[in-house]
Amino acid sequence: MTRLVWFCMQVAYCLHGWDWDIMDRGRSSNSYDSLWGGKARDNPIVSQLPLQYRIRSALTQEQQTAYQVMYRIQEITIKLRTNDLNPPTSRYRSLSPPPVYDSQGKRTNTREHRYRKKLEEERHRLVEIALKMIPHFIAPDDYRRPSKFQDKYYIPINDYPEINFVGLLLGPRGNTLKQLQQQSGCKIVIRGRGSVKEGKAATDLPKGAMNMNEPLHCVISADTEEKIPLGINAVESIIIKAITSPEGQNDLKRGQLRELAVLNGTLREDNRPCPLCGEQGHKKWECSSNPSLSMTVICQRCNQPGHAARDCTSPLNEFGKRTSDGPEFRETKKLQQDAPPPSGPVGSHPSAPGSGSANSGVAPASLHPPGTMAPPGALPPPGSLAAPGTLPPPAALPAPAAPGTLPPPVALPAPATLPQAGVPPAPDASPAVKTAVPIEGPPAPPQTAPPLRQTAATASSAGSSQSAQEEPENARNGVEKAAPGPPAAVLPPPPPPPPPPPPPPSS
């Protein structure tokens, strides 16, 4: 009996092929077929396909994949053309979503609509694969490539209500969301309940922003399907960092707060450069290049900068004068003592006797540029005054002259003369030379003969001292100094009067 059954099976296989309808082996005919089951002759679309569903030759792995992609694209295209949108019957079906209606009251998410949308998305994905894998591939005629691909990422706001996910995604003035869009190449929009602040009108928001039926989520759209995962990963990284970071240790949030302070102009940090010199490490009021007015004020009691005499707090010594024992005072005093003596002729120091500056109150000639005269009552600059309690340096002694030499005679300046009325000029004088009479003034000091050993340097210094003494006198009397010119002609002395006549002889 067993051999007879085996023989019948061999005959059936040779005549009809291996068919499970003939060889059901006692199974019920009401059993559900799997998704991959079914017979080719029961599918009316197979007869319309130009490609064969049975491959009778050996193909490589790439050829098999390309053949399957093209076969599936043609199958989906025929289904969409013939409007064959009956979903396959399955034992296990997912729950249907809640109904969604349009503005006209028609339902937009029926089973047929969802199945059509699923087929279109599958064909879009297969066409993208075929364009990269199969050379010279041509898409179906009724195929329209979508302008953008879209996906959603739901934010777990119900699990973590204490975290401000919307603020972290947006950032200060939306800069964080702009950076995510630039990095991923996708457009990211926050939609759902909690994405819009209370009090905003629907006219001020874009289309779809007021759809509060869905929970809080991010809508990620791009022109290619490969960019969608990049946008989802960018949003997911921020959500995970906000969930896993302890409170106060979220680097992203601290960076956003710092950026917001910079935008508002309220950032306070220690490493900002100085606005005066541009260097770091000090504040504006600590900058050494900032000219301080208080450092230009010098106390007249302790000679210290930074305060006036009435604010001086230096102690009084036994003489009733202000003293200062601070390091700054000692350093200033040491610099004044170590300063070299002033260079110049003897008598030019303001405290030197006989220079004429102590009595007249005019600064010495060495403190003014050559060719200028100090005004009456002018005081020398503060830097030239000696410190209180210090003596001027001793005057330099002239070098001894060689023995047996006499100094040259001292040349006295010619007295200023004015023209005298009624006196004709001398016959020898040129017409350009005019006679002048001396101006009455204070008597000149008596001229003393220089010592025998006076050198030329001493004589020249004495002459300059005398000329410096005469300049203040002339300035005080209002007489201008005559320009140097040719020597004036000196009139000869008048002849002596004739002797009186002798008396007549007496008789």
Swiss-Prot record:
Residues 319-336 have a biased composition (Basic and acidic residues). It comes from the Eukaryota. The keyword Zinc applies. Keywords: Metal-binding, mRNA processing, mRNA splicing, Nucleus, Repeat, RNA-binding, Spliceosome, Zinc, Zinc-finger. Residues 84-110, 307-507 are annotated as: Disordered. Disulfide bonds: none annotated. This is Branchpoint-bridging protein. InterPro entries: BBP-like (IPR045071), KH_1_KHDC4/BBP-like (IPR055256), KH_dom (IPR004087), KH_dom_type_1_sf (IPR036612), SF1-HH (IPR032570), SF1-HH_sf (IPR047086), Znf_CCHC (IPR001878), Znf_CCHC_sf (IPR036875). One of its GO terms (biological process) is mRNA splicing, via spliceosome. It is found in: Nucleus.
